[in-house]
């Protein structure tokens, strides 16, 4: 399928090219670009593209790095994607003083355009996760998210609330993009979208969200409050102030917002100019944007994205990695699958689930890595007893690691995830046993060796008993020897041809019982179990003639 793409140049801009992409297998070779991870369908249902999300956040370079998720949300057609593209320029050129780029360079990255109809749908993330060194030397992963605008003509209230709420739940820095002023309905919508957070806070006694930044675009009153963060702080203090003469509803809105976010700030940005607002062919060139806007833009973007300003994503006091963020994405989207907005408290349940799943994934990954070091692909064969001892030791360490992680939901809620962890570790252990056994040169010869031993023993017994006149026992041994020889030939044919693999597995099971335990009872029990499980193999190998089966059924009726 043909699709237009733009290659990034040294300024963070793009030159447009056309590529032919016919399948998802070719996606990894694409240049960095926006990837839609939350899809809003025509029936207003939501779908998470887990494949795309995993490809971006679970890449080896970033999956174990603590993540900073920056999101821009707000009403549609207010310049969110336009702003995101300046963020991209900064992230690609932050070492440069003049990071905004060439004044004749079109602005590209996240899809945007002028006009009155919506452009972005669902949630898009930039396919390249940026690795940034914070002032303390820690390297963090920075993820940029662009969201569908709220309250467009094609979206329901549920659509708008879901996208805004989900982006707020996932992000560590939420930019609330507003036009001209912070009006009362803007605050009420924010209250609606973060209602989940208020209820979650009542359960955990922690503020559910981190940083909220009111970005007021097209600010027209610099004589009252100056452009920038200082003027924004004074303006926001006045706008969110709770006073005794306010109506209770207005007080509740402001108290609610303060109770949901750890940090709240504001930035006032001037209008970009009439050329931007009225030119249908405006493509983002800086030369067409007012100097006052560019001046404040150069302050805003570093204020948001400089290393010292980055807030690592935290949930319940725990710093989240890219791997953990994937689990939260999956858990949160589940609560939005129904036809109506879920009860806000379900966000706490989803958070607790994701929290526990992330702990399970971390503990399981720890077990997996250490077992790979012990008996991985390039390691020699390990004695089964030693392997079991290492397994029990590492399993105990993984369980201890799981229990040591701070998790929401309480001990009772976490118990089933502990059981899930133990079950998954035991399944991994079985795989490691099989992998380890495959390295044993004698393991491959176990079945034929066992059958040869049976043939030899029955041959000797048949000869001795025949010599002393015990013909019945000799005949029985000869019969067993013949059946064993047929079994050996059958096993060899199965190994050669690859047919009747289930029958081959039955033969291996019986031979393993004789080899490992040396117990006739164990062998007979396994033979009986295998026969009961795979009866259809007998009927497939020795089909009953139709006439004979008909006669038998008629006799039964009589």
From Swiss-Prot:
Its main location: endoplasmic reticulum. It is an enzyme of class 3 (hydrolase). Mg(2+) binds at residue 81. Gene3D superfamilies: AHSP, P-loop containing nucleotide triphosphate hydrolases. Phosphorylated. Phosphorylation, by different kinases, of the N-terminal hypervariable region (HVR) regulates the ATL1-mediated membrane tethering step. Residues 471 are lumenal. GO terms for cellular component: axon; endoplasmic reticulum; endoplasmic reticulum membrane; endoplasmic reticulum tubular network; endoplasmic reticulum tubular network membrane; Golgi apparatus; Golgi cis cisterna membrane; Golgi membrane. Residues 347-438 are annotated as: 3HB (three-helix bundle) domain. GTP binds at residues 77-82, 217-218, 276. It catalyses: GTP + H2O = GDP + phosphate + H(+). Residues 439-447 are annotated as: Linker. One of its GO terms (biological process) is endoplasmic reticulum tubular network membrane organization. Belongs to the TRAFAC class dynamin-like GTPase superfamily. GB1/RHD3 GTPase family. GB1 subfamily. The N-terminal hypervariable region (HVR) regulates ATL1-mediated membrane tethering by organizing ATL1 into a lattice structure on the same membrane. It does not affect GTP hydrolysis or membrane fusion. It has no effect on the GTP hydrolysis and fusion steps. The GB1/RHD3-type G domain mediates GTP-binding and hydrolysis as well as homodimerization. This is Atlastin-1. It comes from Macaca fascicularis (Crab-eating macaque).
């Amino acid at each position: 399928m043909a699709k237009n793409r733009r290659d990034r140049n040294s300024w963070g801009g793009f030159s447009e090219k056309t590529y032919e992409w016919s399948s998802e297998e070719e996606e990894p070779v694409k240049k960095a670009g926006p990837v839609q991870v939350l899809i809003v369908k025509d029936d207003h249902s939501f779908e998470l593209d887990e494949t795309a999300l995993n490809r971006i956040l679970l890449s080896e370079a970033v999956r174990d790095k603590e993540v900073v998720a920056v999101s821009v949300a707000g009403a549609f057609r207010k310049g969110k994607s336009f702003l995101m593209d300046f963020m991209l320029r900064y992230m690609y050129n932050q070492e440069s003083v003049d990071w905004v780029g060439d004044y004749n360079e079109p602005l590209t990255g996240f899809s945007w355009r002028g006009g009155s109809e919506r452009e972005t749908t669902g949630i898009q993330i930039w396919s390249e996760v940026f690795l940034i060194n914070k002032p303390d030397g820690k390297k963090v992963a920075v993820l940029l998210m662009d969201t569908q605008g709220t309250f467009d003509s094609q979206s329901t209230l549920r659509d708008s609330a879901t996208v805004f709420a989900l982006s707020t739940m996932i992000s560590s820095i939420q930019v609330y993009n507003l036009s001209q002023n912070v009006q009362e309905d803007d605050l009420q919508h924010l209250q609606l979208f973060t209602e989940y957070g208020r209820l979650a806070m009542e359960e955990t006694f922690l503020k559910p969200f981190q940083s909220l930044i009111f970005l007021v675009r097209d600010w027209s009153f610099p004589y009252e409050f100056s452009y920038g963060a200082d003027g924004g702080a004074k303006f926001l203090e006045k706008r969110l102030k709770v006073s005794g003469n306010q109506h209770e509803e207005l007080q509740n809105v402001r108290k609610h917002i303060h109770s949901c976010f750890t940090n709240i700030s504001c930035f006032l940005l001037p209008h970009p100019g009439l050329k931007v607002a009225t030119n249908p062919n405006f493509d983002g060139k800086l030369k067409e944007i007012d100097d006052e806007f560019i001046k404040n833009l150069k302050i805003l973007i570093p204020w948001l994205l400089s290393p010292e300003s980055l807030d690592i994503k935290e949930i319940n006091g725990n710093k989240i990695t890219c791997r953990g963020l994937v689990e939260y994405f999956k858990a949160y989207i589940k609560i939005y699958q129904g036809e109506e907005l879920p009860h806000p408290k379900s966000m706490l349940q989803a958070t607790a689930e994701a929290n526990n799943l992330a702990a399970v994934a971390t503990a399981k990954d720890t077990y997996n890595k250490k077992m790979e070091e012990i008996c991985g692909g390039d390691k020699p064969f390990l004695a089964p007893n030693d392997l079991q001892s290492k397994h029990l030791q590492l399993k105990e360490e993984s369980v201890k690691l799981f229990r040591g992680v701070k998790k929401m939901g309480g001990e009772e809620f976490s118990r089933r995830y502990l059981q899930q962890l133990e079950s998954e570790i035991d399944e991994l252990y079985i795989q490691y046993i099989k992998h380890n056994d495959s390295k044993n040169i004698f393991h491959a010869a176990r079945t034929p060796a066992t059958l040869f031993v049976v043939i030899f023993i029955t041959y000797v017994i048949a000869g001795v008993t025949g010599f002393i006149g015990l013909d019945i026992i000799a005949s029985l041994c000869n019969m067993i020897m013949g059946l064993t020889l047929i079994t050996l030939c059958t096993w060899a044919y199965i190994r050669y041809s690859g047919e009747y693999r289930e029958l081959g597995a039955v033969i291996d099971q019986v031979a393993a019982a004789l080899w490992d335990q040396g117990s006739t009872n164990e062998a007979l029990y396994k033979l009986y179990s295998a026969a009961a499980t795979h009866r259809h193999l007998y009927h497939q190998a020795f089909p009953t003639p139709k006439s004979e089966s008909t006669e038998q059924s008629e006799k039964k009726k009589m």
